[in-house]
Amino acid sequence: MAEAKPALEKEAAVKTGSIPSESEDETASHKEGSTSLVSIDEYLAAGVHIGTQQKTQDMMRFVYRVRTDGLYVLDIQSTDERIRVASKLLSHYDPARILVVSSRQYGQHPARMFSRALGTRAMLGRFIPGSLTNPQIHGFFEPDVIIVTDPAGDAQVLKEASSIGVPVVALCDTNNLTSNVDLVIPTNNKGRKALSLVYWLLAREVSRLNDTPFNYELTDFETPL
């Protein structure tokens, strides 16, 4: 993992500056004239930019501003760019060797749909320790790359991935630590609509890059209420 991380992060590097003041609008985080995977309004409506009232030093470079209520807001431009980079990375892997993991309730359905759309493996709900390291465990699997929904909730997965040297792409909120993550996608990883949008975009872009059919709507990825 230690050798893979710099290469992936170098490819995904984004320019960062000081955090804008409270008076600046979230849409200003998007570079003028650039084209995003979906409209900025769609990102905002899904709450992809909504972080938490905690931040880690690891995630500081992805923070756009701090609201007066103490909530950290993520930079939508960084989210869009990282989804592109992650999609390009994943498109180089055999889908059957990709593992998507989610212990979070609102992440399980989008992860399941991502797996269905691309033909990847999925481990949803409680992760059984040893599933990546112990061949005696039922459901043991040796992936080539892993996608996790939340580094905190999926901490055991990160630990095992690190021990076997498998690269990890992770959806990371402002409060996450990223020491065992190879490629960060900064996003709200707790919200129902945010998770569905990010997983839908990843699946759509990987399919596009691999020139394979993608016949799913965003609503197909949304966890039913």
From Swiss-Prot:
Bias (Basic and acidic residues) ranges: 1-13
Gene3D superfamilies: Glucose-6-phosphate isomerase like protein, domain 1
Spans annotated as Disordered: 1-33
Record keyword Ribonucleoprotein present: yes
Pfam families listed in its UniProt record: Ribosomal_S2
Entry GO CC: cytosolic small ribosomal subunit
Annotated NCBIfam families: uS2_euk_arch
Family: Belongs to the universal ribosomal protein uS2 family.
PANTHER family: 40S RIBOSOMAL PROTEIN SA (PTHR11489)
Protein name (record): Small ribosomal subunit protein uS2
Gene: rps2
